[in-house]
A protein has these predicted regions:
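Phosphate-binding P-loop
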Residues: 1-4
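Hydrophobic anchor at the beta1->P-loop junction of P-loop NTPases
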Residues: 7-9
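The conserved Walker
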Residues: 13
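Short phosphate-coordinating micro-motif centered on Lys-Gly-acidic
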Residues: 61-66, 72-132
Length: 132
């Protein structure tokens, strides 16, 4: 993952979206606490010169709520944005590099990953190499 990336996380409540974000942050080297942004809408983390924004739009009722948040300013070359419940703001997102769908399945979960940009394809290739 690198600056300028947007990753969306879809799945029902309890599918593990926030848990996955915790794992991503740990993989990037974050050692502090990782909170769910369900009530705050966004939690942010700073890695030297890289910002990491974790959004949760579950509580958004109307996509127009986006206009009053200032969140558009978070999508920049020096940031990574990971978005839970992206379908609530899909029309407002500038692009999506990687889309992740989590599903509950016995005895755990399934994960579907898809890339929509060259940066997303590179990210998924690096991920595949890590788990191979």
């Amino acid at each position: 993952m690198g600056g300028g990336m947007i990753v969306t996380l879809s799945g029902e409540l309890g599918a593990g979206k926030t848990t996955l974000v915790r794992g991503i942050l740990r993989g990037l080297g974050w050692t502090g606490p990782v909170k769910s942004p369900s009530y705050a809408l966004v939690e942010h983390y700073l890695f030297s010169s890289l910002y990491f924004y974790h959004f949760d739009f579950y509580r958004f009722e109307d996509p127009d709520e986006w206009n009053s948040t200032g969140f558009a300013e978070c999508f920049r070359p020096d940031s990574i944005a990971v978005i839970e419940w992206p379908e609530r703001v899909a029309a407002r997102l500038p692009w999506v590099d990687v889309a992740v769908r989590l599903k509950l399945a016995e005895p755990g979960r399934t994960l579907e990953l898809s890339a929509a940009t060259e940066a997303g394809e590179t990210c998924l290739a690096q991920f595949a190499a890590l788990i191979a």
